[in-house]
Amino acid sequence: MATQAYTELQAAPPPSQPPQAPPQAQPQPPPPPPPAAPQPPQPPTAAATPQPQYVTELQSPQPQAQPPGGQKQYVTELPAVPAPSQPTGAPTPSPAPQQYIVVTVSEGAMRASETVSEASPGSTASQTGVPTQVVQQVQGTQQRLLVQTSVQAKPGHVSPLQLTNIQVPQQALPTQRLVVQSAAPGSKGGQVSLTVHGTQQVHSPPEQSPVQANSSSSKTAGAPTGTVPQQLQVHGVQQSVPVTQERSVVQATPQAPKPGPVQPLTVQGLQPVHVAQEVQQLQQVPVPHVYSSQVQYVEGGDASYTASAIRSSTYSYPETPLYTQTASTSYYEAAGTATQVSTPATSQAVASSGSMPMYVSGSQVVASSTSTGAGASNSSGGGGSGGGGGGGGGGGGGGSGSTGGGGSGAGTYVIQGGYMLGSASQSYSHTTRASPATVQWLLDNYETAEGVSLPRSTLYCHYLLHCQEQKLEPVNAASFGKLIRSVFMGLRTRRLGTRGNSKYHYYGLRIKASSPLLRLMEDQQHMAMRGQPFSQKQRLKPIQKMEGMTNGVAVGQQPSTGLSDISAQVQQYQQFLDASRSLPDFTELDLQGKVLPEGVGPGDIKAFQVLYREHCEAIVDVMVNLQFTLVETLWKTFWRYNLSQPSEAPPLAVHDEAEKRLPKAILVLLSKFEPVLQWTKHCDNVLYQGLVEILIPDVLRPIPSALTQAIRNFAKSLESWLTHAMVNIPEEMLRVKVAAAGAFAQTLRRYTSLNHLAQAARAVLQNTAQINQMLSDLNRVDFANVQEQASWVCRCEDRVVQRLEQDFKVTLQQQNSLEQWAAWLDGVVSQVLKPYQGSAGFPKAAKLFLLKWSFYSSMVIRDLTLRSAASFGSFHLIRLLYDEYMYYLIEHRVAQAKGETPIAVMGEFANLATSLNPLDPDKDEEEEEEEESEDELPQDISLAAGGESPALGPETLEPPAKLARTDARGLFVQALPSS
């Protein structure tokens, strides 16, 4: 049985003595002291309290003597539980922790010179209904409470009572009561007002926290004479760590009523004794005249509170809060059975009614498809206030703890991530219904991985097909999205795609390699990007066995962290490849009349040629099978990587065989021989050009995004793989190999980007509304102004520009396909470069046309931008595609004119940082060709108006970079007269 504590009120000197009371008993002005300057606590001493008065028992108050002036005391007791009288000062047992508020207020005016004396006992206490809200306020060592009440005895006369700076030292008694007694003459219809507002409970350190409770007097309409209607209000009370109950008695005794102004009465420094810091539970007390929607009681000793503060009595909140906060406690389920998987889960209570289920988060899948009854709800956490714990089918509202109060769990699933999936008989607006078959279907066909994404619409289409096969009723897309996020945790949503054609994707989700949905994706050409970011530390090993290699994934490596290996789906992707293409024959190695290095014989040269041919054929084989990761292994095998690493495993049999055919020492000597370097460069160009045509036979043909991403990841890894494999190989050979590999990687990146642009532009060109908008915006472009600005730089003929403009508009109006647009661009290139066909100036003219095309198209886009064209995004996409495809056409035309492969043409300028060759090996030859073709350039019908400006020489056709090396001012100085 918890004992009750009493609070002693320090008595003031009688009125006959001089006003020498302590500071806390002296009258002070009504304004409360600032919270920043709390008064220090005054310990109770005998000198300060010559006549102490103890409140013995408030449950059953005893008669007291009438105070002077006909004063009456009204004792307001919240619990209203009578108890037998006890001796003065003795602790009173209490059956349950309770809390009292007793206010003693005297009416009438006091003089400033008079002091406060204690009230004489004898007044009869009466219980009145006071609307209140229980507030708990305790700090570690000290506590200050400021209560202001005002009693209006007559109209115009108010006697406020202020109680400030209650210091509660840390002592030991189990209970705490706050008693406020209010006394008023029965002959007057005075009104006492005490209001409770905004009670909050917070955790605070053991220091003084000012708490103010301001009350305002109010009149009650229609109050009968002789009654004292009271309204209790407490403003801004902060409640800290709960302790035991405490009783505080405040009594104010009036003097004889005298005419004069009303003086405020202030009592400070009330120090209760015998207080212990213990956990206290506040009992919900039924209070008359208080509505349940306006009063909220806090139960329990923990420091957890509702989502909102305690309701104010001046504003009605008819609804209960939706969420209640519970302690962050992890609940562990019982041992799972064959139909129930149990993992640690953190439950969050949700205030609900009926059989509303509670949310469960953190567990993978907690399911019970057969359990029913009260024990079927053991998968959720404790049920909060207002609802029981939910389970497989949602427990009843009466249960609390780890099980619901009943309910059925048949045919239901509990999914991780905070979603309760009910059975078909239930219908919840905020939950998602899914059958176990659907959840299992998701787990069987999809998996999470880094760096991949899957279109959201595609996933929903797969779900609709699944529901059709299983004869299930599908949910809408939004509910299905919640299910996806519940089954696969950590998914993010990204909007991927080009401007105007982007779609939402689930980032971090892909289709499993064993799923039959891959064939469906192939038909729809909506492949998930199964490519993964490259990590040199951990890479996947190939699927199929190669000579000297092993199958599968190496021990200790994780497939989800390495470079993607799509060789498992080679049958699905080979239709997009040109696997029938074989490696062309290599030319014979020409020694150029040079002497072989010392120690190298003709047989070694022949062995090198045979081994390198076999090496290149092996690379073609693994590329056709999409085993990209094997390329690094083949490089390491040929260049004897393991032989140069003493810490590596013993050399394999394939290394021993290669070592017998061509020792590494001879290989190193040949890597410095110039004829071998030139032959290797030529072979690499042929090899890489063949690989490009195998992987991307048609840049405009749709390619699955998974294959595209795998190719791009492979291109990103090429140079680092090659550099790592050619350790201890002479620098001369390394430069040749890296230059060719760099050109190969750049070509793969450009072609995959071109293919991506082509697919995006294909959707735009097939959209009639977008085509009409583009045509309308293009007709508003001032091409005369564009030609005037561009002609100074491009020097294009007006008739040629007008013809291109008209052809572009006609092709756009006819809504031609992407292939028809490509044919039109190819015709433009052929027409422009026709005068240079077969001449030495063809490469230079082709490059110059590419610069002029790009500059002119940028001027058109600039005009559309300034006009804020609605179809600017579509034009920007089309412009990017046409520029890239024009680059592709020029590249192949120049390579054809030079009799080389496009890889060889691009390799001339590759690896600029490490190459020791000049920037342009053919620079001197091209400068001679420029002089020879001086009379040919003005004859171009589309690039220049032949002979219109004699002042402009042929040097203006040079790219700006080369002009800067000769005469940077020539173009501008000579062009001024004609501008």
Curated annotation (Swiss-Prot):
Lineage per the UniProt record: Eukaryota, Metazoa, Chordata, Craniata, Vertebrata
A Gene Ontology molecular function term of the record: sequence-specific double-stranded DNA binding
Pfam family, one: RFX_DNA_binding
UniProt modified residues of type Phosphoserine: S60, S978, S979
Segments of skewed composition (Gly residues): 380-405
Annotated spans, Necessary for dimerization: 744-979
DNA-binding region: 438-513
Chain intervals for the UniProt region annotation (Disordered): 1-136, 181-227, 370-405, 915-960
Gene3D superfamilies, per database record: Winged helix-like DNA-binding domain superfamily/Winged helix DNA-binding domain
Quaternary data: Homodimer; binds DNA as a homodimer. Heterodimer; heterodimerizes with RFX2 and RFX3.
Protein name: MHC class II regulatory factor RFX1
Recorded superkingdom: Eukaryota
Its biological purpose: Regulatory factor essential for MHC class II genes expression. Binds to the X boxes of MHC class II genes. Also binds to an inverted repeat (ENH1) required for hepatitis B virus genes expression and to the most upstream element (alpha) of the RPL30 promoter.
InterPro entries: DNA-bd_RFX, RFX-like, RFX1_trans_act, WH-like_DNA-bd_sf, WH_DNA-bd_sf
Location, primary (coarse class): nucleus
Source organism: Homo sapiens
Family the entry assigns: Belongs to the RFX family.
Record field: compositional bias (Pro residues): 12-44, 81-96
Localization per record: Nucleus
Biased composition (Acidic residues): 922-938
Keywords: Activator, DNA-binding, Nucleus, Phosphoprotein, Transcription, Transcription regulation
SUPFAM superfamilies the record matches: Winged helix' DNA-binding domain
Biased composition (Low complexity): 45-73, 127-136, 370-379
One cellular component term from this protein's GO annotations in UniProt: intracellular membrane-bounded organelle
Chain intervals with Polar residues compositional bias: 114-126, 190-203, 209-220
A single BP term in Gene Ontology: immune response
